[in-house]
Amino acid sequence: MNILTAADSVLIPVQCEYLALEGLSKLLNTIKIVKNGLNPDLDIEGFLLTMYMRNRLNNQVATEVRQHFGELAFDTVIQRNIRLGEAPSHGKPVMLYDASATGSVNYLTLAKELLKRNRKATKNNK
């Protein structure tokens, strides 16, 4: 909870599994408590779907998250990728371990989406 007290915003990764949705409700409750008491400026940056595979279950979870959270759900998803798992064992971030890996491309796409959202938010606040 300390980190949420000091943060401006939080990016919430959501594993594309149903049990993750249960944990998500607990996290959202914690964020609400922090926002109502210790840090009223805390915002949710967005919900990032992770460990995504193209199967029915993952598609259902992704659809639920997008329907429930709307524009707060990032368009970018982080696909399950072996290179993402290998990179830490080599002491490297995935971008340095294998820049062409699906996971690297996904994270680069996420970075671009974040920048685009923040530029848009900055314009709207002026």
What are these regions (language model features)?
Residues T109-A121:
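C-terminal alpha-helix
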Residues T122-K126:
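Short, basic, low-complexity termini and linkers enriched in Ser/Thr/Gly/Pro
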Residues R80-P88:
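Short, glycine-rich, amphipathic interfacial segments at transmembrane boundaries or analogous
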